[in-house]
Amino acid sequence: MTPRLSPRLLRAARALVGWQLDDAARESGVSVALLEAFESEAGVALSPRSAGKVFAAFELAGVVFIAENGGGAGVRLRRPETSIGSDEATLALEELNASNDE
């Protein structure tokens, strides 16, 4: 179940992937002005269509939205299948050592 998009959740998702508002707007097709007003917590709401576009853009970037389930909504990055720009498998942080650290 996807959580309700809140200004705080949107800011967290942007921080996770390093996007500025203009990046989020470009990737989602939702205007910078609307995203900025939404994030300001001034009572501006996103329509279900706009929220869906925002969710889709961030999910494409690897963000996983976590439903509340009693612990609070949140975001995390999906574990990459392979390294960006290569065919090599990505190593988990705990698997890195001096012999495989480039």
Predicted regions and their residues:
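Short, solvent-exposed alpha-helical "recognition" segments
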Residues: 41-48
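DNA major-groove recognition helix of helix-turn-helix/homeodomain DNA-binding modules
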Residues: 29, 48-66
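A detector for short, charged/polar N-terminal pre-domain segments
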Residues: 1-5
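DNA-binding alpha-helical recognition surfaces that contact promoter or target DNA
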Residues: 9-12, 26, 37, 56
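Short, charged recognition helix plus adjacent turn
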Residues: 63-100
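Short basic helix-loop element that most often maps to the first helix and adjoining turn
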Residues: 9-23, 83-84
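Short alpha-helical DNA-recognition segment
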Residues: 19-37
